[in-house]
């Protein structure tokens, strides 16, 4: 199976809970290599651009407000079948439906404040990585 890259966000509520290290430890324990990461505070324009596919939906303004409410940590993860394995680790988008032991079951506060984001396809991962990371900011792990 080929090595894939996926995109991950630790959202403002999880950053505020000071669980970044715990989440990274779980990524690594699951076999992911962290090949790019940065902390930033999204502007309204960045949040609206990143979530543009949801523009016009009832939850869009609340999502933008939440995602600009504090710092986030964006990361690129690498492993075999990375997109699906990462989504499995995150758990259901709605934390009420997330299985015990998933990140959302452990760190989410609500459907909007669900602690984490993960790409839903390889195409989304490529687009989302390019949104936040420029040339040379992702370092492949070869060991």
Curated annotation (Swiss-Prot):
GO cellular component, one term: cytoplasm
Organism: Salmonella choleraesuis (strain SC-B67)
An annotated Gene Ontology molecular function: metal ion binding
A Pfam family it matches: NDK
Coiled coil region boundaries: none
EC number: 2.7.4.6
Top-level class of the enzyme under EC nomenclature: transferase
Self-association state and partner proteins as the record states: Homotetramer.
Main location: cytoplasm
Catalytic reaction list: dZDP + ATP = dZTP + ADP; a 2'-deoxyribonucleoside 5'-diphosphate + ATP = a 2'-deoxyribonucleoside 5'-triphosphate + ADP; a ribonucleoside 5'-diphosphate + ATP = a ribonucleoside 5'-triphosphate + ADP
Lineage, uppermost ranks: Bacteria, Pseudomonadati, Pseudomonadota, Gammaproteobacteria, Enterobacterales
Record-given protein name: Nucleoside diphosphate kinase
Record pathway: Purine metabolism
Function: Major role in the synthesis of nucleoside triphosphates other than ATP. The ATP gamma phosphate is transferred to the NDP beta phosphate via a ping-pong mechanism, using a phosphorylated active-site intermediate. (Microbial infection) Catalyzes the phosphorylation of dZDP to dZTP, when the bacterium is infected by a phage that produces the substrate for the synthesis of dZTP (2- amino-2'-deoxyadenosine 5'-triphosphate), which is then used by the phage as a DNA polymerase substrate.
């Amino acid at each position: 199976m080929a090595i894939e890259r996926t995109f991950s966000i630790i959202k403002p509520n999880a950053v505020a809970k000071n669980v970044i290290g715990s989440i990274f430890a779980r990524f690594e324990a699951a076999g992911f290599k962290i090949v790019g990461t940065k902390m930033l505070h999204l502007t309204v324009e960045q949040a609206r651009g990143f979530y543009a596919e949801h523009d016009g939906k009832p939850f869009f303004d609340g999502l933008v407000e939440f995602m600009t409410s504090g710092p986030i940590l964006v990361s690129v993860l690498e492993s075999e079948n990375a997109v699906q394995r990462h989504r499995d680790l995150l758990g259901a988008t709605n934390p009420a439906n997330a299985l015990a032991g998933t990140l959302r079951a452990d760190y989410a506060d609500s459907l909007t404040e669900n602690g984490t984001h993960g790409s839903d396809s390889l195409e989304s991962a490529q687009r989302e990585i390019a949104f936040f990371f420029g040339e040379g900011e992702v370092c492949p792990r070869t060991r």
